[in-house]
């Protein structure tokens, strides 16, 4: 999917300090909205059809799960766009390679690929959830390691995107899996301390 490739390109830009590559990834991130909008429309139509047609009621649970996934993906795509914007700003102003932050962003890409593979298979939800959790952990380590505010913001966006991906992976999970949602909320509510010279991350601007 284009989204996973965009995250891979952002990671490569952070790994190498390549400003042109970062800009291309930002341009690609800005184009992701069309894909998510088309997915939302298709899922909404499918759910409406299933609710109206008794012969398709058996499809409702799967469609409801996919519709819930779509809602979380919409937030994650917005976070990705802010992540790309912050990456461009950092690379243009500094340009120093940051392999640890790049690794966190690359981890998001792997989570996106795994979530795409699990879209039609609720039993496969654990792999994308674990990959997103791992990416968030790497971002948390980066926040503690770097004093650069721009890097702190990038790492914070990785954590926000990872949380949305985790929620998407858990969509339609039974009640006994509610602990996973609680863990996601706790991950966001308790960010690590920032180093001297850094500041806590700010929420993404939904207008970007």
Indicate where each model-derived feature is located.
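Intracellular, membrane-proximal regulatory regions of polytopic membrane proteins
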Residues: 2-120
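Soluble C-terminal extramembrane regulatory/interaction domains of multi-pass membrane proteins
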Residues: 65-198, 203-208
């Amino acid at each position: 999917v284009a989204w996973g490739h965009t995250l891979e390109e952002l990671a490569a830009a952070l790994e190498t300090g390549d400003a042109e590559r970062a800009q291309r990834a930002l341009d690609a991130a800005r184009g992701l909205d069309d894909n998510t909008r088309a997915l939302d429309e298709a899922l909404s139509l499918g759910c409406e059809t299933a609710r109206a047609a008794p012969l398709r009621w058996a499809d409702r649970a799967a469609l409801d799960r996919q519709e819930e996934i779509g809602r979380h993906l919409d937030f994650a795509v917005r976070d990705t766009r802010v992540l790309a914007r912050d990456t461009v700003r950092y690379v243009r102003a500094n340009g120093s390679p940051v392999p640890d932050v790049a690794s966190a962003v690359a981890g998001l890409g792997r989570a996106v690929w795994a979530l795409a593979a699990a879209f039609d298979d609720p039993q496969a939800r654990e792999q994308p959830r674990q990959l997103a959790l791992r990416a968030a952990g790497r971002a948390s380590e980066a926040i503690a390691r770097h004093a650069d505010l721009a890097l702190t913001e990038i790492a914070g966006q990785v954590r926000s995107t990872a949380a949305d991906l985790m929620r998407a992976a858990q969509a339609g999970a039974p009640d006994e899996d509610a602990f996973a949602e609680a863990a996601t909320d706790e991950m966001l509510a308790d960010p690590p301390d920032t180093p001297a010279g850094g500041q806590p991350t700010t929420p993404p601007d939904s207008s970007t």
